[in-house]
Design a protein with these regions (language model features):
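Conserved N-terminal segment of class I S-adenosyl-L-methionine
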Residues: 2-135, 228, 232-253
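S-adenosyl-L-methionine-dependent methyltransferase catalytic module, highlighting the catalytic core
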Residues: 25-37, 152-166, 170-253
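An acidic- and aromatic-residue-enriched active-site/binding cleft used to recognize and process polar
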Residues: 118, 144, 176-178
Length: 254
């Protein structure tokens, strides 16, 4: 099973995988139905979640109902419990919109919601994050998760995120983070997908961020809070929702 997961993730193009997953969802939900684990995004329960991982396979990672991963479920709980995202009138820009959130966010009456990506079939706007066709100070809230590790000129991308966010606005920019490393590891001479997979953990990544990631965000102007939200949750909740053991949510304010 684990080898099959690796093959599927590394061989099938992401756009095609997104479409296939929606077709297979009803069958998967029936097969895994149970009460042990709950997806907080839609409150569906299952006897187990699906395994996931490009290299190291994680058990109970992918929800069969929303296709949320551990980090998505943690972010959902954070937004629900710690912010006014679901109640305040705000204008939201969502980069590389995750299927786990898309339909839920579209139905929220309090937000004006736009999605953006260069390639995603789920996006409303097709655009390069380094050259956004958007006026400055346009959005109250920006979600841009697991995007920056794909961008060669991440400083330019961060500057664009800062530019289109309103003063006082909030951005959440999660990335794969190696908390053991102070410095980010990047080598732009590595272009072969297999070599990138070895070096950066995924075939289309161009770096592994270290703890200096937050300094990069601060350099372009953001005030950054490193929110370790799992520390606020009980062990029972972490098991119930299949949450990451360690995850920092970068909450960035302009």
């Amino acid at each position: 099973m684990n080898n099959l997961v690796k093959i599927v993730l590394n061989v099938i193009p992401r756009n095609l995988l997104t479409r296939l997953s929606f077709l297979l969802k009803p069958l998967i939900k029936i097969y895994l139905f149970g009460k042990k684990h709950v997806d907080p995004i839609d409150n569906s329960s299952f006897r187990k979640f699906l395994p996931y991982g490009y290299n190291k396979i994680r058990v109970n990672a992918l929800s069969p109902s929303t296709f949320s991963l551990e980090r998505h479920r943690l972010l959902w709980l954070y937004l629900k419990r710690e912010t006014d995202f679901f109640s305040k009138k705000i204008k939201v820009l969502h980069f590389a919109p995750e299927a786990a959130f898309l339909e839920k966010f579209k139905k929220l009456k309090n937000i004006s919601y736009s999605t953006i990506d260069l390639n995603s079939p789920l996006a409303d706007i097709k655009a390069d994050i380094c050259n956004l066709p958007i006026c400055s100070d346009s959005y109250d809230f920006i979600l841009c998760n697991h995007v920056l590790e794909h961008i060669v000129d991440d400083e330019k991308a961060m500057k664009e995120l800062y530019r289109v966010l309103k003063k006082g606005g909030t951005g959440i920019f999660q990335v794969p983070l190696n908390m053991s490393n102070k410095q980010t590891y990047e080598d732009f001479t590595i272009t072969d997908p297999k070599e990138r997979n070895k070096a950066f953990g995924q075939y289309d990544h161009v770096r592994v961020y270290g703890m200096d990631f937050f300094e990069r965000l601060e350099k372009v102007g953001f005030k950054v809070e490193k929110c370790e939200y799992t520390l606020k949750l009980s062990d029972d909740e972490k098991i119930k929702y299949c949450l990451p053991k360690k995850e920092i949510i970068p909450v960035c304010v302009k």
